[in-house]
Amino acid sequence: MQNDAGEFVDLYVPRKCSASNRIIGAKDHASIQINIAEVDRVTGRFNGQFKTYAICGAIRRMGEADDSLLRLAKTDSIVAK
């Protein structure tokens, strides 16, 4: 919901799983959110930006979290294909 100034005023904004596009509920305590830093290709130093991925508990329970993160990192060109 937005107020008259156009600002979001909701108390809870649900996240979506980056791998399965499912909504991560408030009671999904097995879900994770991970930030992967972007580094400069020449110097190898952190350039101040990162990619955020959210993985729901169902993906983690199936043991697919590592494959999902690798697939997402490849599509964002963080990991070489």
Swiss-Prot record:
It comes from Danio rerio (Zebrafish). GO terms for biological process: cytoplasmic translation; endonucleolytic cleavage in ITS1 to separate SSU-rRNA from 5.8S rRNA and LSU-rRNA from tricistronic rRNA transcript (SSU-rRNA, 5.8S rRNA, LSU-rRNA); endonucleolytic cleavage to generate mature 3'-end of SSU-rRNA from (SSU-rRNA, 5.8S rRNA, LSU-rRNA). It is found in: Cytoplasm, Cytosol; Cytoplasm; Rough endoplasmic reticulum. GO terms for cellular component: cytosolic small ribosomal subunit; rough endoplasmic reticulum. PANTHER family: 40S RIBOSOMAL PROTEIN S21. Pfam families: Ribosomal_S21e. GO terms for molecular function: structural constituent of ribosome. InterPro entries: Ribosomal_eS21, Ribosomal_eS21_CS, Ribosomal_eS21_sf. Component of the 40S small ribosomal subunit. This is Small ribosomal subunit protein eS21. Component of the small ribosomal subunit. The ribosome is a large ribonucleoprotein complex responsible for the synthesis of proteins in the cell. Its main location: cytoplasm. Keywords: Cytoplasm, Endoplasmic reticulum, Ribonucleoprotein, Ribosomal protein. Belongs to the eukaryotic ribosomal protein eS21 family.
